[in-house]
A protein has these predicted regions:
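Transmembrane alpha-helices and adjacent helix-loop boundaries
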Residues: 1-178
Length: 178
């Protein structure tokens, strides 16, 4: 994504600019519902036209596709910003030493980019962890769904909401330490 946005190929750069603008501008929950139901409708329209049966998308698959699609836009911006933050002198020095473009990227640009990208990658990871709570709306049995069901069956929804929050806090705290 970042390479496409920085590409000299204007149509490709415009497509990815539109993708990141759209994804970053529309709430995650709305996108999740649009992708889950929209993809299902589109696939069933195709299978109906081909005379085949209906397709039911597994909520786990839908959740993975949706989170990947949404947060791909955020990671695209993280890597684009990191690429642009590397001083041009690094590339000039690599050229002066006779590095090929792939050697320049692998030995100079990528390590330098990662210094700038790591804070954004960590932040995106934290947001993805918390966004997994939204996939329960697609019917996926996750932590939120399990605690919601436990709260309904015991008539103690507040207690289980606190438990759910603590579980997510544990996930994010442990992943911060990694």
């Amino acid at each position: 994504g970042a390479g496409a946005k920085l590409s000299a190929n204007k149509p490709l750069a415009l497509i990815f600019e539109g993708y990141t603008t759209l994804i970053r501008g529309v709430p995650d929950l709305v996108l999740m519902l649009l992708i889950f139901y929209g993809l299902q409708i589109a696939l069933n329209g195709i299978t109906d036209a081909m005379g085949m049966g209906q397709i039911d998308i597994d909520p786990m698959v839908a959740g993975i596709i949706t989170l990947g699609f949404i947060y791909g836009a955020y990671f695209t911006e993280t890597f684009r910003g990191a690429y642009m933050a590397v001083p041009k002198g690094h590339i000039e020095a690599a050229t002066a030493f006779g590095f090929t473009s792939s050697q320049t990227f692998r030995r100079i640009m990528f390590p330098a980019m990662m210094r700038y990208a790591l804070p954004g990658i960590g932040n995106n990871w934290q947001v993805i962890l918390k966004a997994t709570a939204l996939v329960s709306l697609l019917g996926l049995e996750d932590v939120v769904k399990a605690t919601q069901l436990a709260g309904k069956s015991t008539w103690e929804p507040f207690y289980f909401a606190i438990v759910c929050g603590l579980i997510y806090l544990l996930f994010t705290t442990v992943s911060n330490g990694v």
